[in-house]
């Protein structure tokens, strides 16, 4: 049992070590600094399923450390929650495939309201529609689940 637990921990460590940390992270931080701290906006985080759960954790953690952030469920956004999104905000859209329909639709709806809101994508697919529409794509790699 201890060997299995250690193996799981080792796999998690390897996955974290293999996350690319080139200049892209700096670009994402620049967007967040500009939108949240200089323009007094907030980070809007969204994802479906497991990606949504991760997004909720990100938004909660950022808010608790003083960086205004909220999670919006992409389906709920289409039914009234878009009013939370303001012109100085930034979007963090999370989808492992980068093809999640609701996430792509959310981007379309937000751009119709505020066409200059920057999108930061968190995805495992650099060739996806989500990666293409984003200003910054944080590629997670393809770690084993």
Predicted segments with their positions:
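An N-terminal, well-structured beta->alpha segment
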Residues: 1-41
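Glycine-rich phosphate-binding loops that contact phosphosugars or nucleotide phosphates
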Residues: 33, 42-145
């Amino acid at each position: 049992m201890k060997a299995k637990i250690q193996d799981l921990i080792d796999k998690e460590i390897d996955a974290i070590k293999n996350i690319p940390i080139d200049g892209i992270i700096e670009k994402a931080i620049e967007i967040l600094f500009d939108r949240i701290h200089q323009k007094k906006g907030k980070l809007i985080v969204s994802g479906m399923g497991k990606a949504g759960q991760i997004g909720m954790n990100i938004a909660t953690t950022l808010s608790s450390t003083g960086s205004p952030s909220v999670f919006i469920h992409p389906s709920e956004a289409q039914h009234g929650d878009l009013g939370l999104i303001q012109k100085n905000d930034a979007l963090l859209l999370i989808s492992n495939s980068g093809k999640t329909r609701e996430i792509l639709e959310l981007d379309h709806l937000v751009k119709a309201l505020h066409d200059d809101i920057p999108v930061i994508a968190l995805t495992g697919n650099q060739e996806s529609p989500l990666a293409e529409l984003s200003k910054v794509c944080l590629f997670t790699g393809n770690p084993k689940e």
